[in-house]
């Protein structure tokens, strides 16, 4: 199965999660990350590899969470 990727990025002062060609909008980065991790965890439980990536203010991407390698729920 293909890896499910969830991208958390800022746009116009708000945050969004992009997954499978759709955007989901949030007021805070923390909430966007939490929901992306929750969705990735559910995808992982259904047999998919899953990853959450977060874009910094410089445009660089970092891995926030991967299914099977990080604790769930994430701390914080």
Language-model features and meaning:
Residues 1-3, 31, 43, 73-76:
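Short, solvent-exposed secondary-structure boundary motifs
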Residues 2-23:
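Short aromatic-glycine-(Arg/Gly/Cys) micro-motifs in beta-strand/loop hairpins
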Residues 4, 56-76:
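A cross-kingdom feature marking charged/low-complexity
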Residues 5-11, 51-58:
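Short beta-strand segments and strand-loop junctions that repeat across beta-rich extracellular domains
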Residues 20, 29, 66:
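Surface loops and adjacent helix of pleckstrin homology
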Residues 23-25, 32, 69-70:
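Short, surface-exposed beta-strand-loop junctions and turns on beta-sheet-rich folds
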Residues 24-27, 55:
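Intrinsically disordered, low-complexity proline/glycine-rich segments
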Residues 27-45, 49:
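A short, charged, amphipathic alpha-helix used as a generic interaction element across diverse proteins
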């Amino acid at each position: 199965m293909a890896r499910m990727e969830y991208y958390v990025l800022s746009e116009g002062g708000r945050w969004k999660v992009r997954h499978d060609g759709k955007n989901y909008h949030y007021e805070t980065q923390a909430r966007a990350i939490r929901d992306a991790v929750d969705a990735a965890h559910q995808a992982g439980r259904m047999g998919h590899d899953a990853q959450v990536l977060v874009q910094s203010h410089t445009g660089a991407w970092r891995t926030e969470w991967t299914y099977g390698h990080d604790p769930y729920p994430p701390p914080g």
